[in-house]
Amino acid sequence: MCGIVGAIAQRDVAEILLEGLRRLEYRGYDSAGLAVVDAEGHMTRLRRLGKVQMLAQAAEEHPLHGGTGIAHTRWATHGEPSEANAHPHVSEHIVVVHNGIIENHEPLREALKARGYTFVSETDTEVIAHLVNWELKQGGTLREAVLRAIPQLRGAYGTVIMDTRHPDTLLAARSGSPLVIGLGMGENFIASDQLALLPVTRRFIFLEEGDIAEITRRSVNIFDNTGAEVKRQDIESNLQYDAGDKGIYRHYMQKEIYEQPNAIKNTLTGRISHGQVDLSELGPNADELLSKVEHIQILACGTSYNSGMVSRYWFESLAGIPCDVEIASEFRYRKSAVRRNSLMITLSQSGETADTLAGLRLSKELGYLGSLAICNVPGSSLVRESDLALMTNAGTEIGVASTKAFTTQLTVLLMLVAKLSRLKGLDASIEHDIVHGLQALPSRIEQMLSQDKRIELLAEDFSDKHHALFLGRGDQYPIALEGALKLKEISYIHAEAYAAGELKHGPLALIDADMPVIVVAPNNELLEKLKSNIEEVRARGGQLYVFADQDAGFVSNDNMHIIEMPHVEEVIAPIFYTVPLQLLAYHVALIKGTDVDQPRNLAKSVTVE
């Protein structure tokens, strides 16, 4: 979602700030701005509605000089997307950028108005600027003012503050929204994501919950919310910003779909040895913890929730471990009973998903056996706060609609299933079949991608559709959910997914010639049941699009289009059948002319509730 970049140096920092914002564009935003202060305290602020490129053009027309600055990309929560609502916000000499939501902004706004402050935006962020300004007027340093202001805020925030009268210092505070400090030589930086700072540093300090940081060119001092100084470890990051340009592809999403064979190879690298899954990266004590697991609770949101749903079938049928999957935003607000020796698994591409993080923190109070994060970003909050972590190693994913992060999550989950089956002493053939399937998976997906042109032609049938229904059975039901999510995310077609056995319990009422029905049909023990469901749709004139195993025995006719898929090992079928649904959504979105990589109203990483 929103992005923050800050810098304090002896050189001009405007281009550093702009490049940092460019690297955060993939998260989604509607406006951008920056403010730079020179050594004499002269501040220049630029804000623009739209893309960072528009802000960069404005900076070329009105050059910004100064060694201290903060910048921001905004995803609207309070107040419409507009230049007036774009950050940074100013209260006299106080300048603020902020990620998150201040839940008590309305009473604070009224109190500040009563003190004579005038608001020029609809945002909750302007409250922070005026509040810090007020506290500074009561006396003390900027740090002391921030320490008094922060306890008055309720909600989530990652905020960076500067005082134009003292351009040698930046103040930062975080609670529920990530901030990372980048360490340089005679210069320091701060951002909401380390990716933004990779061009200028590889040394980072990740702020923890409640931290307040005072940053100058030559020092970084960190305090807890009582004002006591604390030490935080600095780390050397080997994270790569490997998105590059789009190359031969029209969109990042298309590129990332085609990267999946190599992404899965990267996920598997170093993790299969002598026909077994090797997850020794979990550390020497992991086997002791995992061997005690009697139940698994998975928390996730969005696409990650769908991957968790697939893995539930695997954990139960292949490892014999009961598994529940819950949307993180639901889990955190209900009273739940914790089962004996239950392992908490959290799934997140970014590792900063607000509800998933909150669920993880809650689980530590509830008595779970331990926690394991599956994530694509090393050093993210989810990874740092979990007992164990497995990286998906998918590489940077730019498209808001997740593709390779989803399939690599499933790859990691399936490896974990194999390891647990071995620890439980189950038949060795289970792990053998999983390893064999995973090793074959990249080439199977490459085979499938060769059918892209056929799927592109198929997508033309959806150009005038307003609704779509996806069906699947067993572990393909969550793949139907994922297919529907992809279609609605990027084409803006209303799409729903159902377990095919539920047709007669409601969805059948929707079937007519204008309702496309997309079915995933691998050749497994549920195929005959699925064929009966397909006949129910055909009998009512529904238009069927069936992605079917080449040996499943389907024949195309007037209202049933069969897209034959190469036969794949049953254990990897859910991962495999995801890819044609990704391509279908992509081509439909192309035809409809939507913004594929940054669909309206959506953000890559949901860091607020």
UniProtKB/Swiss-Prot annotation:
E.C. no: 2.6.1.16
Keyword Transferase listed: yes
Pfam families for the chain: GATase_6, SIS
Residue ranges of every copy of the Glutamine amidotransferase type-2 domain listed in the record: 2-218
Localization, UniProt: Cytoplasm
Keywords: Aminotransferase, Cytoplasm, Glutamine amidotransferase, Repeat, Transferase
Enzyme class: transferase
Domain SIS: 286-426, 458-599
Job of this protein: Catalyzes the first step in hexosamine metabolism, converting fructose-6P into glucosamine-6P using glutamine as a nitrogen source.
Listed name of the protein: Glutamine--fructose-6-phosphate aminotransferase [isomerizing]
Gene: glmS
